[in-house]
Amino acid sequence: MQRKKTFDSFRRCKVVILSVLMSFCMTAAFAQSGAVKGKVLDELGEPIIGANIVEKGTTNGTITDMDGNYSLTVNDLKKAVLQASFIGYNTIEESVKGRSTVEIKLSPSVVNLGEVVAIGYGTQTRREITGSVANVSEESFNKGITRDASDLLQGKVAGLTITSGSGDVTRGSTMRLRGTSTLQNDQGPLIVIDGIPGGDMSTVAPSDIESISVLKDASSAAIYGSRAAGGVVLITTKRGSGSKTQISYDGYVAFDQMANKPDLMNADEWRGYANSKGLDYSVYDQYGADTDWFDELTRTGVSQNHSISLSGGGSKNNYRASYTYLDRNGIMRDNDMQRHSFRFQFQQRAINDRLRIGLAGSATLTDSHVPNGDNFVLAYSMLPVYPVYNADGSYFTKVNVEYDQGNPVQNQNLNERKNSNVYFYGAGDIQFEIINGLNIKANLYKSRFSNEYSRYDDSRTTVGQGNNGFAQKRNRAWDRNLMEWTLDYNKSFGADEKHKLNAILGYSWEDNTYSYFFAQNRNFLINDLSYNALQSGAGLKTGDVESGKNYYKLISMFARAHYSYDERYMITATVRRDGSSKFGANHKWGTFPSVSAAWGISQEAFMQDVNWINDLKLRAGYGVTGNQDGLQPYKSMELYGMSGIYYDNGNWATSYKISQNANPDLKWESTAMLNIGLDFSLFNGRLGGTIEWYDKRTSDMLYTYKVPTPPYVYDRMQANVGDMKNTGIEVLLNLDVIRNKTFNWNMSLNLSHNKNEITKLSSDLYTTDRIYTGDPWIRGASGVTSHVVEEGRPVGQFFMLECTGIKDGKYIITDLNGDGEISDDDRTYVGDAQPDLTFGWQNNFTWKNWDFSFFFRGTIGNKVLNNPRAAYANNTYLIGTNALDDELTYTMKESSRVCSYYLENGSFIRLDNLALGYTFDTKKINWLDKARLYFAAQNLFVITGYKGLDPEVELFRGESSDTDAGLSPGIEPRQFFPKARTFTLGVNLTF
């Protein structure tokens, strides 16, 4: 009943607010206006193309043309103030004072101190920020084909690790900020899209993104409370501005090629091996084939992207609408994705600009085919003398002695795994300035994400043969409602207005509902209907139909106050209090405070004669954040689950038993962080950057422990027990190497070092000495783990037999306990999957109308387990299966083992992105504002000592599932989807 009342209240509130929104959307207040024009120049007197000109206090703005000229209609020629900004230059303000022509000159700054940066529930200039916030604008995004915001950011932010260890175009990247801080799956940053927390990056087309801010320390992220322990990524999408209607088109075509593939024996090499061993291979070699199975499963993937947008506005409103179509075809023949993205935004101002009303919405529709990784396991082991097709055109289906899954090409062509996603959201906000500087704002948000997964295994394939066809359907839906109220106050005071105060109070209410339905069947008469007629199967079993639903609610209050004096002394204090239905009865509410301060050293009087220092600021902050995303609803409650069925009195009945113990003390994980940073800009802005040190401590980590029965009914229980710490240093350097009228060269380097350690795993009630994790799935050694999690060690610690070499085809294993036998008791610590150093190096060049850039990134000091070499550089299964053309294949005399022999240096440097563009002179074409043609290449080459396919593997995912995600990094899996080398040709047009 209480929940129904809550929904009714929320519904009534939505109706009232949305009614007000719509009633004012058509309202515009009359204001005296006038036209002002001029030119924007750099420090050398050269025109700046594409500089932003905005009337202060409004979203009324425009950009400069090819000659640096602008024209803008302002509300009041006497009172209007123009704000001019451009990437790499200081933002300045120029009062119009009745003039019709205003020339503006910008001074360069590598670290743009006037740049406005999103900080969560507000913005600040970079000069006044007291926390650790990194901002990446559109000009600095990675170029070429991109799936979502993570592709734009990869390698750009010190301390933010983004890995895409798979060539599967449907699979997103993993993001981790400042190391691993939990034992749970969900440890990535909180995604906030246009102020709405809890977003999904895949629902925003990269072409719609204007900038991305990363809140790196707890003092910045604490305003998001129990969901911000992994950091916060703020995505700001493009909005309409200016008085001119603008149409933009961005399009490209891209070509994917396999960057690297396994070096397997071909037919002649396989025969040569058999002859050298005196083996009779005639039973296999009857078909005259020489098949490269990886070539048969892959292709050159051709992709295309088209994005069109319409934007504009006037002195009282602005709008933008866009549509993006992405057709992505991977290098695996059964891997593709088609995505349609729609987005709109509208804002209206009224009542002398005191009232602002905004509407926004988005819809994303995605259809994709997910590749079956087992086919690539088959490609490793299928003999090269086997053909793809028989002489009559049918598929060759001779049994593979190592992995009885049939012909991988047949599997790829006849079996199907499809995902269909539909996402939409609608949002409305209304803001009113009660008095000067005091604003009240209400936001409403509604979203729904649905996923339909469909699978069919054809009865003609070995995979589907045993079931005579197997079909599966799964439907899932996530519904979310959010309402937020904020009251913010901005005031400058004092005789010279050097004192500035900004404060915000807020209330947030949201509910989330998840539901699913699952069904599967087998034994179909025909394959033609695929997964579209489950009822036609004749093999339904117990457990083939399932459905479920869960619900949770989050209520929050938050506040932040920021004070600055003369840009010299700044302090920020934040607090958030979260109440979640996920938490146990004894811990329903959590409080997350933070405080940070900054000293603008360069603003002091004693620094005024130090001309080579343009800006110098020291920052320090401490805060507490939480992680509740790894905690599922109802985990604190005693639950019953189905235990089986039984026959009673002529009827089948279902039996139930306790499947989860109650834990009223279950709560969020808590992360406290101390951050100290130094920001600097030197030599007239030619050299700038940031140096930061942090100490991050996580406590009350969630993990599922074994518990005694009795007193507990169930032998597993999730509890808050463990502690972990991360300490690190981050460096960002920006350098203008050359800066003149015709040629510019800018260089950027980011470095990060993080040290991780688990400091506690057990308590008096819940104990575990070690957590063994990571199954490399090596044939002949299945079930043997590769990692250990224990106190005093980092996450990613390899723990296995120590091998000092190979002699006479056998491993030389160290007998550590000296008992004369090699067993699990001889395992030891042999390396760490976490790198000592992560880096990114960007170079940008401009010459006249040409622009060129390249970007390297890499890691130093990490280990990678070369799992394919362990599994396939061995002759144990020869000659019935294929193997790598490796010296070990010819010399080994025993089965593969999980040992340190296959642990290799995973350090690498990758030329990740290269782009060359030309911007045409369009000043003689009055209907065309901008035309740019560009070429981009991604993943061009990798420099590494690693002998496998690619040293950059999924750093935070398990081998074959996500059950131990984050606890067994650094394994190149057997189900490795080959990465692509991509070449892109694109065009940007603005009308």
Report residues per predicted region:
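Short, small/polar-rich motifs associated with maturation and membrane association
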Residues: 2-344, 349-350, 355-360, 364, ...
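Extracellular/periplasmic, surface-exposed regions of secreted and cell-surface proteins
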Residues: 29, 141, 188, 194, ...
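Short aromatic-centered micro-motifs
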Residues: 53, 84, 191, 389, ...
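C-terminal extracellular loops and terminal segments
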Residues: 150-154, 718-725, 766-798, 830-840, ...
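Flexible glycine-rich, low-complexity coil/linker segments exposed to the extracellular/periplasmic environment
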Residues: 262-295, 384-412, 529-550, 643-661, ...
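Exposed, low-structure sequence patches enriched in small/polar residues
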Residues: 506, 560-562, 750, 797-806, ...
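C-terminal beta-barrel architecture of Gram-negative outer-membrane proteins
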Residues: 818-820, 852-911, 949
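Glycine-rich, aromatic-lined ligand/substrate-binding cores of catalytic
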Residues: 832-864
